């Protein structure tokens, strides 16, 4: 994308944010059917933030005051490799709606960074999209259940490796 095109899109996004800001005063969960129709990559974007915040909160509970240690731990939990491993173990317990979102996210056209394999990145995108779906549709109990299970899976992997 060229710089001028980027600047134009950024300004358009700011205009939309201003419009949305005047129309909405707080977050209101959408119905599952509304969220299923959303772009899977956008759900993954939200899911990435939700899971990152969850992991940061868990790590901060340890009362470690060294930010470098905290950052390293968080990075190991939220990297594509860890998320992919967790997703592979969680995939069998996903609901039909969650499987639909995961499949769409996995098959989306995303640029894979050099730090992970295509499979890992696609699985982690699917995992994040499921979390984004649950967050956006207000399914907090299910969201917490999957994040806790993913956390436990990753923690076991880190303690053995």
What are these regions (language model features)?
Residues 1-161:
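Double-stranded RNA-binding/processing signature
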